[in-house]
Amino acid sequence: MQKVSVRMMAAMLAIVLAGSVAAAQPVRAAIPSALPGVAFTPGTTPIDLIDDRGRPVRLAAPARRIISLLPSLTEIICALDACERLVGVDRFSNWPPQVDRLPRLGGLEDALVERIVALKPDLVLAAASARVVDRLEALRIPVLALEPKTLEGTGRVITTVAAAIGDPVAGAAQWRAISTRIEAAARRVPASMRGQRVYFEVSSAPHAAGAGSFVGDVLALLGMANIVPASMGVFPRLNPEHVVRAQPQLIIGSEAALRDMPKRPGWAALSALRERRTCAFAPAAYDVLVRPGPRLGEAADLLADC
């Protein structure tokens, strides 16, 4: 069961209620039927948007000089064929490769405000939790604060970003392509994998991907059962004893995390570790799994192959 490969980004988790989501359930149910947060007709201005804080954002014209301060948002821009509009990114954005040449502008907690201002962006994309958002808005720089946590939220963010660049139709097409790929992955999950109890580790604290996260949503559609119920939060920090008591049948995480797990108190007793029923992923593959963006279809493929 153990697979260690950049080609296989896995994350098998889903809803604790076994059978509540069948592997064949259409992903389309999770796709927004309209463009929530968007009030825009192609070719018209201004563009009125609603961000993840519930705040209105008005753009006088489609954004042309964009700064992205979150890797998933960087990936969305490029998947919409607008990579050339990026003038700067956060330090963690590393896909697609062409973003490597762009100026690095810090991260969630330490964005470089002076450098951002000097680049004269007409739009900054940032996480809703980023400390820099209020400061940039005080400087009259338009900010879309977007931080999807669910599969449906990812679709909403993709369509909102597409509207911000003046091409909402491309956003809808991108989301349809993602959902189609997830559906295809769900159809080929082996029967032996469906319903398995899965633990997906996000960090060694340990933090896990809960059933209510975008990771959990994808895993539910693949027919997996998450040992971390939605009631515990999206990416909750767990008492390590929770994992030991839950006795997951499959454990998924980064290569580094899987190497460390047997050393944790009580974890050597986990049958999944003893029997190597694990999926460990190299950094590049793991990025695909934990970023709510255009590569979620690829993530579903990797999960189906775990």
Question: Could you say what each language-model-derived stretch is?
Answer:
Residues 2-5, 13-72, 167-199, 305-306:
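Bacterial Sec-exported substrate-binding components of ABC uptake systems
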Residues 46, 50, 64-119, 123-129, ...:
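A short, structured surface patch at a secondary-structure boundary
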Residues 56, 123, 131-207, 228-230, ...:
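Extracytoplasmic substrate-binding proteins
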Residues 62, 69-76, 82, 112, ...:
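Stable alpha-helical elements in mature extracytoplasmic
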Residues 70, 128-129, 202-204, 231, ...:
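Short secondary-structure boundary segments
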Residues 92-95, 209-235:
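Alpha-helical, coiled-coil/dimerization segments enriched in small aliphatic residues
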